[in-house]
A protein has these predicted regions:
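A detector of single, family-specific signature residues
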Residues: 1-370
Length: 370
């Protein structure tokens, strides 16, 4: 085949069909074969990565969309046309695309685990917000007694006493035993809570409100309990895998990293030190570096719309944790706030500074020492 010849073919979504297609290409052309995809991960990527004769070139869907619109102002879209345009982009501008180079099995496993764990945390937050809204309808005292709802203590409390009427009937010894079993032994805190329970007045006694909402609270606590258990399972697996990586010590030594964020930072930088030419490359890829647009006398600075959102979330969440754990980070954050910056803007600016520092530590394999 030559550069001018094009063949269109639709591959059935079956493993054996993909195998047959891949082997037929290898038998026909031999050597290394470039494959342009609008994905950098997913089933088709995983399927093709097992063949050593395929080199995968991820094409950003936005890049392909803009390229398509340049020749089709009507914005008409068709998958076969998109496939041909992706091929055209790769042939005409090969220097603009970087082949997908898989990292080690350990780092890819860890990357998948930390992202799945964060999705479970999102589920937990969503369930907790629903539970808070439900309790406000008939049992608002729970929000006064417990600052955090996403705990086993709250799940067990609601499961045992789903309404205020039921908990007020409980004996003092029963309540004390319950709290002691959940490692709550501060006598002054316990006394205040018990007095509050006995003095509480119900928001409503209307069965049409209490019955359905108490049932919903029970269902939500069941879901919350499952989410908490699932997150703990992921924490245990991550805790076994992450410390085995030789670079883990670089990230666990960072202030505020901890067992949750240190593995995420390890995954964010990875182990391919040639992947990022500079700290600025990391800042841009992660979506932390701002974008400047200029046209005539207009000048507009905004954040990046297109970036790996989980990666940006990792750096922002970690930067927020360093405010109270690093002297200079706290001082810099307060300085930005005094200038009138919003909380999010100040934290992103702090993350921008941190990336430069961590990048240097990562490149030189030197643990951070404030």
């Amino acid at each position: 085949a030559d550069d001018q010849q094009r063949e269109l073919y639709c591959i059935p979504h079956q493993v054996d069909q993909i195998e047959e297609w891949a082997q037929s290409l290898h038998k026909r052309f031999g050597g290394v074969i470039a494959v342009a995809l609008e994905l950098s991960k997913g089933p088709i990527v995983y399927a093709l990565q097992k063949y050593d004769f395929f080199v995968i070139y991820p094409v950003n869907p936005s890049t392909l969309a803009k390229y398509r619109e340049a020749f089709t102002p009507s914005r008409a879209k068709d998958d076969p046309t998109d496939a041909e345009l992706a091929l055209d982009l790769l042939i005409r501008h090969p220097e603009r695309f970087t082949p997908l180079k898989p990292q080690s099995v350990e780092i890819r496993t860890l990357a998948c685990l930390v992202e799945q764990r964060r999705n479970l945390v999102n589920d937990k937050i969503r369930i907790t917000n629903r539970l808070r809204s439900t309790l406000k309808q008939y049992y608002p005292q729970m929000l006064e007694w417990f600052e955090q709802l996403d705990t086993v203590l709250v799940c067990d409390f609601i499961a045992r006493w789903p309404t205020l009427t039921q908990v007020k009937r409980a004996r003092k010894n029963t309540l004390e035993k319950f709290f002691h079993e959940h490692n709550m032994r501060f006598s002054h805190v316990l006394d205040v809570r018990l007095k509050s329970i006995k003095a509480a007045m119900p928001l409503t006694l209307d069965a049409a409100v209490v019955t359905p909402y108490s049932l919903q609270a029970l269902v939500l606590t069941d879901q919350l309990r499952v989410s908490l258990q699932a997150i703990q399972r992921y924490d245990d697996e991550i805790a076994k895998l992450a410390p085995k990586h030789p670079d883990y010590g670089l990230f666990s030594a960072l202030p505020g990293a901890g067992p949750s964020l240190a593995p995420r930072l390890l995954v964010a930088f990875g182990e391919q030190r040639e992947r990022f030419a500079s700290a600025a490359a990391v800042q841009k890829y992660a979506g932390i570096a701002p974008v400047t647009e200029r046209s005539g006398k207009k000048h507009w600075v905004h954040w990046r719309w297109q970036c790996p959102t989980f990666l940006r979330q990792t750096f922002v969440e970690w930067a927020a944790q360093t405010i109270n754990k690093s002297f200079w980070a706290g001082a810099y954050y307060r300085q930005q706030r005094e200038k009138g910056w919003t909380y999010q803007s100040a934290v992103r600016a702090l993350a921008f500074k941190w990336i430069r520092i961590v990048y240097r530590c990562w490149q030189t394999r030197t643990p951070y020492n404030e």
